[in-house]
């Protein structure tokens, strides 16, 4: 499991880990955005919170994640990205894993200062059609403003705008930061410097997983 404040690069690293170890990448953010795009009731509820920079309530996330990790492709492991975000979610996850005789092996904290987060997220762009994500500095599109995958327009999402990012960071420090102590007490917390180049961050994570 990877966690940190929004924009710390968790998603990028989680996808690389999933590819290297051939395990599912489970991202609540992706699940919520898919539901928002499809106009589901869950998506409508989630969008209300996400647009305000607030965390989606536990009851809208826990059941969805618990169902996902019990699917067949998760039997050999999985990487969680963006969940749990609160102590109650972490406790619910531990309880669910215990029921299927599994435990969380690592909780990896991708450490990035707040000021870096605001700059990073301001450069994010997302495709209006397929949901692909880019960054104007770190991962730009081949044609400015156009998605490489489908050619549709790319935009700055509402939840990546500076004022929303500041709110999200405040929520993170209040609700998610305590997870550091929670997983430290379990002896599974590891930390990596998220300000390094992405390939170096990934190498540090692989080294941890190989311990």
Cite the ranges covered by each PLM segment.
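Glycine-rich phosphate-binding loop of ATP-dependent small-molecule kinases
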Residues: 1-211
């Amino acid at each position: 499991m990877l966690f940190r404040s929004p924009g710390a690069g968790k998603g990028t690293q989680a996808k690389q880990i999933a590819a290297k170890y051939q395990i599912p990448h489970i991202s609540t953010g992706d699940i919520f955005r898919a539901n928002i795009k499809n106009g589901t009731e869950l998506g409508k509820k989630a969008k209300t919170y996400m647009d305000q920079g607030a965390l989606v309530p536990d009851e809208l996330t826990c059941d969805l994640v618990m169902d996902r990790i019990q699917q067949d492709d998760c039997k050999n492991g999985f990487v969680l990205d963006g969940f749990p975000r609160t102590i109650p979610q972490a406790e619910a996850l531990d309880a669910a894993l215990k029921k299927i005789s599994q435990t969380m092996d690592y909780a990896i904290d991708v450490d990035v200062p707040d000021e870096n987060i605001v700059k990073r997220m301001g450069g994010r762009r997302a495709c209006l059609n397929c949901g692909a994500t880019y960054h104007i500095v770190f991962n730009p599109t081949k044609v400015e403003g156009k998605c490489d995958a489908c050619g549709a327009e790319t935009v700055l999402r509402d939840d990546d705008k500076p004022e929303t990012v500041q709110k999200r960071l405040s929520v993170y420090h209040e609700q998610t930061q305590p997870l550091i102590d929670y997983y430290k007490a379990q002896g599974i917390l590891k930390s990596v410097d998220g300000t390094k180049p992405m390939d170096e961050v990934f190498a540090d994570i692989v080294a941890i997983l190989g311990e």
